[in-house]
Amino acid sequence: MSAIEHIRGSTWHGRKGDLKNAFRYSIDYLCLDIENAPPKKGIFKRDSGWLFGLYGSDHGGPVGDGRGAAWVRDVAAGYNIELPGKILLLAQPRIFGHVFNPVSFWLCHDAQDRLFLVIAEVTNTFGDRHSYLCKHTDLRPIQPSDRLKADKIFHVSPFQPIQGAYEFRFDIRPEKIGIWIDLQMPQGGVMATLTGPRRALSNFSILGALLRRPFGSRRVLGLIHLQALRLWWKGAKYRPRPTPPKAEIS
């Protein structure tokens, strides 16, 4: 598949425990086969331009120095995993030259076009990045009801400790996507979701996104800091940024 899809989605975050906080907002994601997608589709440009596009160097490796799908293939090879099918990248676009993706997803398919491996690429506001490998031990296809766990080892929010485990659920269908991430801790935790329909990217959909959300990921950063201020105001404990893990992926 070489089509580029535009997910006009919705994300919801809810803090669990004694100090609760929740918010929902609309968001734009792109889903594309980064190895085969066209370099240009109307206003959209891949690896060039500033208005609305996606750069491979923004993903797959260190922030700003990524290698795209080549990094994904190297990661899989390190686990002795073959990737016979397409590799889709689900990520927010660059808008007016700026991008910040709190989490992007590499969706890897088997030879029968079934999702069997996901890499959740997490980036914090300090410019650190760590990725979580989500799969079954026998590499069977990931079903919508499956729950895949990964220990949390990366600092995301200064108001959450580095403890507990993430439980991921992926419902990736031809017509829509649904992703649920449940941070489970002895006390508290966070639930985050991303849902939305899959539609073909077009100049019309891009212009709609620019009109509705003209600041793109700058808006996302602003909302993150707004929620941090709300948590601080409610009395949440602030934790300074620790040294990030040496491993790129776990």
Model-derived features with residue positions:
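Mature, function-bearing regions of proteins
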Residues: 1-250
